[in-house]
């Protein structure tokens, strides 16, 4: 058996699979519910533009998850562990932490032994406090395009490089006392190994520091973040990067063997970022298929053999296959924005369960209610500062009449508020995805398939609109779809143990029984429907330009 872990914003999840890559067990720790003493809301604390999480909460979650895992499966049969962490977030391990990891005692908790040697908080991917640092990072390298060409992305507020620079400015003494700066992925791997684990080849691409094609940290960027002549010191704090995503880093630490019953031969395989792990959960055909992860954020993922960068999207090294890449579009306002619309609709109709999606879905699926596309409406809903497009926070509603685009207010007679917000937000979100992924496809005008994972993949109305707007069949994992990231991590572990002589794609296809693994949940629409949505794309671009002009936020 193989274990995949996913240390995400709101939960730590674990998925156990067998040699045939079938899911056997799923366990989870919900931070707000199971570790309520930390008083997080959706896994984080907020202070203006700052969004961060308590690192000790993650340590407690590891212990609790393994307690639950031990009670549900024979963990001694787990041959290898891999997985993922939320991308970009940094963990500052202070001097003495390596020694403490080496000597963990199974009679005490992880938190009790490591708390004093870790900076208390880690910035979350939703953090938007590094505008100044992003501008400085782009300036030192020649602009957003130059930085994207080098590192795969323009400077982003959540990326680790800008976050480290801000941390050094705000906490100079702690920075100097830092022994290791880890990403969540190799922090979790370090805990499991009880020694410092290297950074992962794919996850390191989310730092704005890594020269992807030459596979090394760029000294100019290190100098900008660490200060003049301090680049080598920062490189030492970051440590090495493991190029081989299937590398056996070593056996699991004695703490986990004694406390939970893991085999001392259980291997730890490099953990990667949550998005790179997610693409490993499905056999995506490069340039043909799209994976939509519908979680707190919305991410569109594609595999590709071509290194073609743009400030409009992210390019990462593939987590397993060398000389292959992963393209990612990331939207901060995913499920949280849709939930706000849902809540407003539920309040209008006095729905007792405010978490119910029934009224929201009816507003989209009811044949007597015209969808936003039919009424030629667009809605941009950004309760948080958005990444794509760089705008917000704010809400913008638009109506299309002939060749003209008009900004409208929710109280105008032409807009049935809040019911029509449901179609507007779902259709506009997917129109933006369509607009940005089409140039990345190889030899086809629209995707062959879209795979959906994450919580909203179970929502019929949302999936229906994805199919209509993107113009293709929509598929979902039969098992583990809500935990696709952890599933991908488990498959990564299985490949590391059993995939010798095969590429990752060959290994997965060898074990992949499509009839058992995935299900077709929505058929592609008519060509006419797809074309009608295509006519809205120029108006969406205009709407986003208007929102950018009206927003004073530079992202």
Swiss-Prot record:
Binding-site residues, substrate: 88, 158, 274-275
GO biological process: D-xylose metabolic process; xylulose catabolic process; xylulose metabolic process
Keyword Nucleotide-binding found: yes
Keywords in alphabetical order: ATP-binding, Carbohydrate metabolism, Cytoplasm, Kinase, Nucleotide-binding, Transferase, Xylose metabolism
Subcellular location: Cytoplasm
Database matches in Pfam families: FGGY_C (PF02782), FGGY_N (PF00370)
UniProt binding sites for ATP: 357, 455-456, 459
Entry annotated with the keyword DNA repair: no
Broad class of the protein's primary localization: cytoplasm
Name of the featured protein: Xylulose kinase
Species of origin: Schizosaccharomyces pombe (strain 972 / ATCC 24843)
Gene: xks1
